[in-house]
Amino acid sequence: MVTPIAVVGPTASGKSALGIALAHKLDGEVVNVDSMQLYKGMDIGTAKLTVEEREGIAHHQLDVWDVTETASVARFQSDAVADVEDIMSRGKTPILVGGSMLYVQSLVDDWQFPPTDSAVRARFEARLADIGVEALHAELTQLDPEAAAVIESNDPRRTVRALEVIELTGQPFQASQPPKDAPPRWGTRIIGLKTTPEWLNPRIEQRTARMFEQGFVAEVEHLVQQGLIADSTAGRAIGYSQVLAAMAGEMTWEDAFERTVTGTRRYVRRQRSWFNRDHRVSWVDASGDPTAQALEILGLQ
């Protein structure tokens, strides 16, 4: 039976390159698990591989949503599970590539999403309107520090959702997620790219500089014409949020660059913390030869 391989780890650690290399070795197809690469036209700012960079490897779950759509882990899970099972039915190896934490977990674990209640949600949305997202996120931190650690303090939708789940279930938001010591769906093997700040931070700065050199601002301007606004899932993405603020005169372009770098570093710390808690991950050194290390772990070297 074909076993899927998941490639996880922090932003700028080389997941896409490792995914392509493994797909070549294992006759695989890539399933994207980066929530922002699901958006059409969000290419430069998400380091989405170009068609040429995909080297003939089929990719799934790229360019699925319009920038006006609200992201949905449940919708992604349904669509991506279907993709993985289709790839397996054709005798090919699904290579799941991405660092979006809840999206990875929704795919490799059989995550049944907790209930919703429009009245409870409306109450938290009213409180959001009253006190603002950062204050509401601080309340979440008091109730459930683990949930607050993986939800950005400027993400109103997921902050409200976490509070809704806590109230409806009487448990921490994290308790609604499957345990990370359960067998992964399909027996998926999880390969993680281990990095140090000393190695990764310069890569983040170089990647951010390259984004701006390659036309990131023009990309955002084009997406604004497609309906991108700051108060949306896509508009709150790291980099896009800062460029939109600079376009609106709310910060300088220098600040936009610096805050993209620091925002990415903050996100990387959360990714490290999240994936380090998953003992099913087999780690490879991102600064070495991760492909050779991964193949050895998989018993293919």
From Swiss-Prot:
UniProt xrefs under Gene3D superfamilies: 1.10.20.140, P-loop containing nucleotide triphosphate hydrolases (3.40.50.300)
Coiled coil: none
Residues involved in ATP binding: 9-16
Catalytic reaction equation(s): adenosine(37) in tRNA + dimethylallyl diphosphate = N(6)-dimethylallyladenosine(37) in tRNA + diphosphate
EC number, UniProt record: 2.5.1.75
Signal peptide: none
UniProt cofactor(s): Mg(2+)
Pfam families, per database record: IPPT
Region ranges (Interaction with substrate tRNA): 34-37
The keyword Cytoplasm appears for this protein: no
SUPFAM superfamilies (UniProt xref): P-loop containing nucleoside triphosphate hydrolases
Ligand binding (substrate): 11-16
Top-rank lineage group of the source organism: Bacteria
Keywords on record: ATP-binding, Magnesium, Nucleotide-binding, Transferase, tRNA processing
GO terms (BP aspect): tRNA modification
Gene Ontology molecular-function annotations: ATP binding; tRNA dimethylallyltransferase activity
Sequence similarity: Belongs to the IPP transferase family.
Assembly and interaction partners: Monomer.
Function: Catalyzes the transfer of a dimethylallyl group onto the adenine at position 37 in tRNAs that read codons beginning with uridine, leading to the formation of N6-(dimethylallyl)adenosine (i(6)A).
Protein name: tRNA dimethylallyltransferase
Provenance organism: Corynebacterium glutamicum (strain ATCC 13032 / DSM 20300 / JCM 1318 / BCRC 11384 / CCUG 27702 / LMG 3730 / NBRC 12168 / NCIMB 10025 / NRRL B-2784 / 534)
